[in-house]
A protein has these predicted regions:
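Classical Sec-dependent N-terminal signal peptides that target proteins to the secretory pathway
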Residues: 2-22
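Mature N-terminal, pre-catalytic/accessory segment of carbohydrate-active enzymes
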Residues: 19-96, 100-101, 602-604, 615-618
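Charge-rich, solvent-exposed alpha-helical interaction surfaces
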Residues: 38, 68-75, 120-127, 167, ...
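Extended ligand-binding groove/face enriched in aromatic
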Residues: 79-221
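Extracellular polysaccharide-recognition and catalytic grooves
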Residues: 138, 144-150, 170-404
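Extended polysaccharide-engagement surfaces of secreted carbohydrate-active enzymes
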Residues: 282-575, 581-586
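Beta-strand-rich recognition/accessory modules
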Residues: 540, 577-618
Length: 618
């Protein structure tokens, strides 16, 4: 519709008059030249009146985070909370799960949720503030910032009398770096890892609420010590490069900056956050999941870290005036939260992505127990709540156009995206947790585990319910000297030779070799039809095909006729169709964090092609 110039002139004149009548409103320009310029811009550049087509008008409310936090807390019964309190009261504070639980209860009470716990919360907070200054081996590096987050919310909402808040703050004045923190940098080149970043943020939060005098040397030492572990992409290298701890540490610096740090190391770290933030968009799956790889993976808190990073970057780009990019980050936030909500609908709620009883600790490291890691998801969702800008629309994400990205060799990952599918390849896995090969194949809307969400090692550092385990991924195999060699084996070497993206597809060529000059070449082609894999060898070629067999509660339906291997699970079907050769059951079972997988093999002389698809069940 054509906009009449005299209507725009009238609009500007009325606004100018309104500005003169309202001294609280900044005056709008109302010169004739400005009016003509505006009319010209309106008629000749109509895009200024519209959102980008990739941006939805849907806004995400901050209250969504509070609702998710409340749902997470519901995994703890009142009896469980009381028991936890009594244990800490009797035995002293020994870890940070209890302060995290306390802080999140306080935040929810401040928002009018779980007020039934108000009296018990006072006892819990009293115990936290009493115990924290007494210990240096209770992971105070993690806890203090979270206790302060709760105090800020309680103070803001006037949930308790000021005297009560000041009493809790007063207890935190007794904290000293030397007596209360165990791991921190004493010099810029100290060889300490992410605990130093946690200590940095906890101390900064003490400065923020004025219970400690600012010590910028301490803060700068922590920031400098962590910088030595940043790769060329701005990603943080914790020991053995676990994917989630890259996000954890970046998130801690985002908190530091959100609360005002602009010291010596701000610019370099902020640039790293910006650079890695863009790459995080490439690593997040179509299911909303963070990349697999290394320790602490496949827990619900993983996507909490992704959400806070995406919220931080969304706000950054909104400030820069790039609403398209800001909305893309918001779209990724929305997707990560959808993934958390999916798992929170499961009963009973678990902190790890499987359905095994909590008591088994299936899929968990020794340190990753329920009491600590369930509430951790809420802790970092609260940080995302702090960063959330409700005015940014949630953007539509493009999962159809082909895209590829390869990390630095420190993280040894290749990512493919096309046709609503997503694939992740680990070409030099950490065998404490993973195996090399294609460790993830997802389709948007489908369960992440139906094909594969993570690979598995033969000697996992997390609990499984089997004495003997087999390393597996979707990986090439080779028949050599009378035996099958697996690309998931520790001795296998994978090399990414090339990868490329086209309009609606993504592809890669990867070689796999073993000692003794055994070698295969494998081509991967991802499109709306799924993933096509072609293996070429100078002898019999194979491809390992994991079939999801048990999630801790449900046993998917598996069928194999030699040409088609199908897995039916949660109203979806994963199909492996062999173009040439035969699919055999190896008789082996593999165990990853998500559950059990029966291992099949596609076989053929010299060359084979398998087409993998994930489709709704008819």
């Amino acid at each position: 519709m054509k906009i009449r110039p005299f209507l725009l002139i009238l609009f500007f004149l009325l606004n100018c008059v309104g500005c003169n009548l309202r001294p609280d409103v900044r005056k709008l320009p109302c010169s004739v030249s400005k009016i003509k310029e505006t009319i010209s811009n309106t008629q000749n550049n109509k895009k200024t009146l519209r959102y980008d087509k990739s941006v939805r008008r849907t806004k995400m409310k901050k209250s969504r985070y509070i609702s998710l936090m409340e749902k997470i807390l519901s995994a703890y019964t009142n009896e469980h909370i009381t028991q936890y309190y009594n244990e800490v009261k009797a035995n002293g504070l020994k870890e940070h799960g209890y302060p995290r639980l306390t802080a999140n209860i306080g935040i929810l009470i401040a928002h009018g949720k779980r007020t039934d716990l108000k009296e018990q919360f006072v006892q819990m907070m009293d115990l936290c503030c009493q115990e924290i200054p007494l210990h240096k081996n209770a992971a105070n590096e993690f806890s203090i910032k979270e206790v302060i987050f709760a105090l800020l919310e309680l103070e803001k909402h006037q949930t308790f009398p000021r005297e009560q808040i000041e009493r809790w703050k007063g207890a935190l004045k007794n904290v000293t770096v030397e007596n209360c923190y165990r791991v921190y940098a004493t010099a810029p080149d100290s060889q300490v890892y992410n605990w130093a970043a946690f200590a940095m943020v906890s101390e900064w939060m003490r400065y923020h609420i004025k219970v400690a005098e600012p010590d910028f040397k301490f803060i700068n030492n922590q920031a400098a010590s962590q910088w030595q572990f940043v790769d060329v992409n701005g990603m943080y290298r914790d020991p053995h490069e676990p994917m989630i701890y890259d996000m954890v540490t970046r998130g801690l610096f985002a908190v530091l900056f959100h609360f005002g740090y602009r010291g010596e190391y701000f610019e370099r770290w902020d640039a790293a956050l910006k650079r890695a933030g863009l790459l995080t968009l490439k690593m997040l799956s179509v299911t909303g999941e963070v990349p697999f790889g290394g320790r602490s993976n496949q827990f619900l808190h993983n996507e909490s870290h992704a959400a806070l990073i995406m919220e931080y970057e969304a706000a950054r780009y909104a400030r820069l005036g790039d609403m398209k990019m800001a909305s893309s980050f918001k779209g990724s936030v929305d997707r990560a939260l959808d993934n958390i909500e999916l798992w929170l609908r499961q009963q009973p709620i678990t902190h790890v992505k499987n359905s095994f009883p909590r008591s088994t600790r299936y899929g968990c490291e020794k340190y990753a127990y329920f009491d600590k890691y369930m509430i951790t998801a809420a802790s970092f969702l609260y940080v995302a709540y702090l960063f959330c800008d409700e005015t940014i629309p949630v953007g539509e994400l493009d999962d159809v156009t082909g895209a590829t990205w390869q990390s630095s060799d420190h993280f040894h990952k290749l990512f493919l995206r096309a046709g609503n599918y997503f694939a992740e390849y680990d070409y030099r896995a950490d065998y404490n947790y993973d195996a090399s090969g294609l460790g993830r194949l997802h389709r948007k809307g489908a369960p992440g585990t139906i094909a594969l969400a993570i690979p598995a090692t033969d000697q996992p550092k997390y609990a499984v319910n089997a004495d003997e385990t087999t390393a597996f991924s979707i990986t090439p195999e080779f028949f050599h000297n009378g035996q099958w060699l697996s690309g998931a084996a520790r001795e296998a070497k994978h090399q990414v030779k090339s990868h490329r993206a086209q309009k609606n597809s993504a592809s890669a060529e990867i070689s796999c070799s073993w000692p003794g000059n055994a070698r295969v070449e494998t081509a991967y082609f991802l499109s709306e039809k799924g993933l096509q894999i072609t293996v070429k060898a100078n002898s019999k070629a194979g491809l390992m095909l994991p079939a999801f067999a048990f999630d801790g509660k449900i046993r998917p339906e598996i069928s194999n006729d030699g040409k088609r291997l199908s897995i039916k699970y949660q109203n979806w079907v994963c199909s492996y169709v062999l173009v040439n050769g035969i699919i055999r059951d190896t008789g082996k079972t593999g165990y990853n964090r998500n559950g059990h997988y029966k291992l099949f093999r596609a076989e053929n002389d010299r060359e084979l092609t398998v087409e993998i698809s994930i489709t709704p069940q008819p």
